Amino acid sequence: MGQLGYTQGDLGWSELNTTDAAAAVEFYSALVGWEKKGEPMPGYFVFGREGEMFGGITNLQPGDTTPRWMPYISVDDLSATLAKAESLGAAVILPPMALPEDGGHIAIIKDPQGVATGLAQYNKKES
């Protein structure tokens, strides 16, 4: 089981890339009761509810003009999954990068239909 309680194939973490992250935090808090759980990196807000964290909200990167949600699918072995994705016709558009606080690693692929999807391998929780 992954750090956040996800297992292989689960749709887990979701991330909103938007033009105004702070305003989006306020909007979703008012709309559905999500709570801001912290800001582990400047401009990256973690949100959740009832003690659970399940997503992030951040500003678009320079040059990016398309606000969007990015789902992350949990995998047990990110390297093996990326290799398999490429063999099935996907392209890696963000190579593996470490999550803060030794949380694991993420990558983003573009599937054969052109859809960007995140993959995440979370580090195991210490008992």
Locations of regions flagged by a protein language model:
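Vicinal oxygen chelate
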Residues: 1-7, 11-19, 60-127
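Core segments of cupin and vicinal oxygen chelate
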Residues: 2, 8-53, 87
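Conserved short beta-strand elements that form part of the metal-binding/catalytic scaffold
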Residues: 32-68, 112, 116-121
